[in-house]
Amino acid sequence: MIGKEATIPEIVLELQELVQPTADLHCYEELSEEETEEERPHIPYKIVAPCCFCGSKLRLIVVATPIGIRSQEELLLGEVQLVCPNCRGKLRHD
């Protein structure tokens, strides 16, 4: 510091010395192939659900992970409804 008051560049310099660590914080650990996360298997599922208009049975065959099929179930029991081909013609598309 030159003079009685510190200037902005001098303050920034002092802060950088406090903030920048001297230790190496990078992780150089490598995972073996056994430790890597295995892909979850895609399993075929048959979904039977009613048409939201006429109630006729709709059958879908999907391939999903166990987590994926649970998500699909939550959607079909909640905010997503299926429509049969006959009722689809009655719908107005935008």
UniProtKB/Swiss-Prot annotation:
Judging by the UniProt lineage, the source's domain of life is Viruses
**Segments carrying motif Nuclear export signal:** 69-77
- What biological processes does GO assign it? DNA-templated transcription; symbiont-mediated perturbation of host cell cycle G1/S transition checkpoint; symbiont-mediated suppression of host innate immune response; symbiont-mediated suppression of host type I interferon-mediated signaling pathway
Record note on modification: Highly phosphorylated.
Query: Any domain commentary?
Result: The E7 terminal domain is an intrinsically disordered domain, whose flexibility and conformational transitions confer target adaptability to the oncoprotein. It allows adaptation to a variety of protein targets and exposes the PEST degradation sequence that regulates its turnover in the cell.
UniProt family annotation: Belongs to the papillomaviridae E7 protein family.
What protein am I looking at? Answer: Protein E7
Lineage from the top down?
Answer: Viruses, Monodnaviria, Shotokuvirae, Cossaviricota, Papovaviricetes
